[in-house]
Every structure is written in C-alpha cells, then in structure tokens.
Design a protein with these regions (language model features):
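Non-catalytic structural scaffold of enzyme domains
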Residues: 1-210
Length: 210
C-alpha cells in the first residue's frame, strides 16, 4: 500500500481512496502518518446495515484477512446496534473476479456455498465487505432473493471524498475535466483485458514503476 501511495503521489494526486477493505483495516493509520494528503478508507457498512435490519440479523461477506482483523471486529462491536452480525469469509471469490471469471458456473457455485447458509440463518441484510464483490452483486442478489437488502460502500465513500475535498479546498472547478488512468503492479495484456471487462469499456493499463 505504501509503495502504491508513493507512486500516485509522485503523479500529483490530491487525495487517495484505499478502495479495499482489507488494505484499509491493515494499513490506513500507518499510511496517514506518512503522507500529507487526505487518505479515505473503505470499511464495511456495518452501521447502516444494523440500523435498517428488521430481523436484526445481518451478514457480512468479507475476505479471510478482513474477517480476522481486530479493527474489523471492533467496528462490529461499535456499530452492531443490537443486531446479530454473521461474518462469512469468502476464500476464492476475489480470485475469480480478478481472473475475469465472475460470471462462471464455478463462481456462482461458490457464491451459493457462502450465501445460502446465511439465508437459512434468517438474515435480511447483507453487506458486501470487499470492493471486489459489487462485480458479482447481480449474482448475489439472485441467490439472496428480494427479501434481503444488499449494501455496498461506494456511495458513502464518494460522499466522504467529496466532503473532504470541499473542506480542504481541493475540489476542481466546474470547468475542469477529469481523466481516468489505470495502473497495476501486474501489467499484462491479459490484465488489461480483464480491467476493460470490469470497467465496461476499453482502457490502457500502465505498470507501476518499481
């Protein structure tokens, strides 16, 4: 995370969003202490999930690393609001998505393996505790059914980023147009193809300098 942040700062970024729950819980405090630009983290939306759950049974789909992290457990203790919070580690799911196999039968079978037991437990709210998981949100919705509300973190993170940019007078003028650039520690044509598939339009992938 530090390596990536240094690369981005060298390119002139004015804020960084750590768009990864696992990296946020493991590295955000250290990174904030080392850089002088705003760092926004991503954490599972436990608070709104617990607040809106009627059955008071909430589940979080998370990576193995996030599920074992103490900061993550502390967030649950802080925000559960009397709800029972079930944690479901999802080994293998990120790998399917990063390989461009998120629509495969094998990926769908893995999702069923993780989600069906949660439905049987009576949850009515499901938190996507990894920023990869919205890429399979449609499949998750089909498996979970209409009775389960699915929550992910993109919207609140966008609101928080906008708020910080405005507060620190770092927001762009209305005349300025942004641009998208894509960098990866693994820069190959296959990766570029997968990135384009996930982004839903062709893109050029650049390598992060060593």
């Amino acid at each position: 995370v530090n390596f990536i942040a240094k690369q981005l700062i060298a390119k002139g970024v004015k804020a960084i969003v750590i768009a990864c729950n696992t990296a946020t819980v493991n590295a955000i405090e250290q990174l904030r202490a080392q850089v002088n630009i705003p760092i926004i983290g991503v954490e599972p939306a436990i608070k709104p999930a617990a607040k809106q759950s009627i059955s008071k049974k909430v589940a979080i789909l998370a990576t193995q690393a996030t599920s074992e992290n103490q900061r993550f457990k502390d967030l649950i203790d802080l925000h559960h609001n009397g709800a029972q919070v079930l944690i479901q580690p999802c080994p293998g799911l990120v790998e399917f998505i990063e390989q461009g196999k998120q629509n495969s039968q094998a990926c769908n079978a893995l999702l069923r393996q993780y989600i069906v037991p949660l439905i049987d437990e009576g949850i009515d709210t499901l938190v996507l505790g990894c920023t990869h998981y919205p890429f399979v949100q449609q499949q998750i919705s089909i498996i979970a059914g209409q009775q389960v509300n699915i929550i992910e973190t993109a919207a609140p993170v966008t609101v928080q980023l906008t708020k910080i940019l405005l507060e620190q007078k770092l927001d762009a003028s209305k005349e300025q147009q942004g641009q998208s650039q894509f960098f990866s520690s693994l820069e190959t044509k296959e990766q570029e193809k997968i990135f384009s598939q996930l982004w839903q339009e062709p893109l050029i992938l650049h390598a992060l300098a060593p």
